[in-house]
């Protein structure tokens, strides 16, 4: 009886060691897969590649504060003069400027403020990109939160959340309008260059 009990204990211990060995092997395989997987995520890598090609001097979120400041000043200067070109300044520049600010600073608040400032006529003189740099450098928003009542902070956050949804809806409508306007002249939309509107 004692011999059988020892045998059972040895077999149980052996199975436990085997299971632990299998688990260790699985963990090693997972670690090797994670280490060897250098293509994740592919969209971000492609995005970085095209950004380097189109904007070779575009700083990243990990760039120095000086390079971000220079970039922000240039972006604000270009944004100020884009108001001279009505169609480009209203239809295309807000999306370009907002995207660049988001890629450099990576903040939802900066994204909303930039899109709002570039979209509303008459606000082009505001240096939004430079303000984003100052907020990142000196943490202005958290300092302001300390002196604002809680209800105002909640109101601002709710406004930002609602504005994000409105901005997405407006962008989709603008894209639809642009496609609808140019669709008669685009072959892949069933139109042609010789399209003539009949009244």
UniProtKB/Swiss-Prot annotation:
Question: Where's it mainly located?
Answer: membrane
Superkingdom of origin: Eukaryota
Regarding the membrane, this protein is recorded as: Multi-pass membrane protein
Tell me where it resides: Membrane
Q: Which keywords belong to this entry?
A: Membrane, Transmembrane, Transmembrane helix
An example Gene Ontology cellular component term from the record?
Answer: membrane
Q: Which residues cross the membrane?
A: 73-93, 96-116, 166-186
**Location of region: Disordered:** 1-41
Protein biosynthesis as UniProt keyword: no
Compositionally biased region (Acidic residues) = 23-35
Q: What is this protein called?
A: Putative uncharacterized transmembrane protein DDB_G0284801
Give the organism, scientific name. Answer: Dictyostelium discoideum (Social amoeba)
């Amino acid at each position: 009886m004692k011999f059988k009990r020892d045998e059972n204990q040895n077999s149980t211990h052996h199975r436990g060691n085997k299971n632990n060995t299998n688990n260790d092997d699985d963990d090693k395989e997972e670690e090797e897969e994670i280490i060897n997987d250098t293509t994740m995520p592919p969209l971000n890598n492609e995005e970085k590649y095209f950004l380097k090609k189109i904007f070779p001097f575009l700083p990243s979120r990990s760039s120095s504060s000086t390079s971000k400041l220079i970039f922000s000043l240039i972006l604000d200067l270009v944004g100020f003069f884009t108001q001279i070109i009505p169609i480009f300044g209203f239809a295309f520049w807000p999306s370009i400027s907002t995207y660049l600010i988001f890629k450099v600073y990576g903040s939802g608040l900066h994204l909303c403020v930039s899109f709002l400032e570039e979209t509303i006529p008459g606000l082009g003189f505001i240096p939004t990109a430079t303000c984003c740099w100052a907020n990142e450098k000196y943490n202005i928003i958290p300092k302001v939160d300390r002196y604002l009542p809680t209800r105002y902070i909640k109101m601002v956050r709710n406004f930002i959340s609602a504005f994000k949804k409105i901005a997405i809806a407006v962008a989709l409508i603008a894209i639809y309008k642009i496609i609808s306007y140019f669709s008669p002249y685009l072959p892949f939309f069933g139109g042609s260059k010789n399209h003539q509107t009949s009244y």
